[in-house]
Design a protein with these regions (language model features):
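Structured extracytoplasmic
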Residues: 1-95, 99-107, 168-173
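Gly/Pro-enriched, hydrophobic low-complexity segments
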Residues: 67-69, 81-82, 91-173
Length: 173
């Protein structure tokens, strides 16, 4: 399916994290938003600026809580398949695909890439299940990439969200 982007948001930032005490700081170096300037569209897409944390048990997407594929209860909601092993950015990783155990649950389909030595999450790509029933959304894809910044510390370095919106032909009422 071909897509023409009509709204793109990009930013480059430096992110600082301190484990003890737990503090985070982000300095945005540059930001650019390109595309349509329609108020109702901007309100709808405003939720796209939410922070998606794959390590949380629940991931909030457009007002609905999805079970993370790496949540504490992931084995109750997902089936996992070891699919491949490959190099990603000089890291040997295992590709593990996941699918929902049952239809109708707020879950994802997708893949995890796990570092073979540290078992850290290198990359995740997830798609909403077609039964999620989110208004105006046909398809949603979340991709996150993590890089090792210290021997035991991996950090989110790339965060992508792709949303395929479906507009109603006629107004409501």
């Amino acid at each position: 399916k071909s897509a023409l982007p009509f709204f793109i948001s990009e930013s480059i930032s430096k992110f600082y994290y301190n484990r003890e005490p737990n503090r985070k700081k982000e300095i945005i170096k540059a930001a650019k938003i390109s595309g349509v300037e329609n108020k109702s569209f901007m309100e709808l897409t405003g939720e796209m600026y939410q922070q998606v944390n794959i390590y949380n048990n629940q991931i909030s997407v457009f007002g609905k809580n999805f079970t993370s594929p790496i949540s504490k209860n992931c084995l109750k909601h997902y089936k996992f398949y070891l699919l491949d092993s490959l190099f990603i950015d000089n890291n040997w990783c295992y590709q593990i695909d996941f699918i929902p155990k049952r239809g109708g649950e707020l879950t994802f389909d997708g893949s995890l890439w796990i570092n073979d030595t540290t078992y850290a999450l290198k990359k995740v790509k997830g798609y909403i299940n077609k039964t999620a029933n989110i208004n105006f959304i046909n398809e949603l894809e979340i991709t996150q990439t993590f890089n090792q910044v210290e021997p035991e510390i991996w950090m989110l370095t790339k965060d992508e969200l792709f949303v395929d919106f479906e507009w109603l032909e006629k107004g409501l009422g």
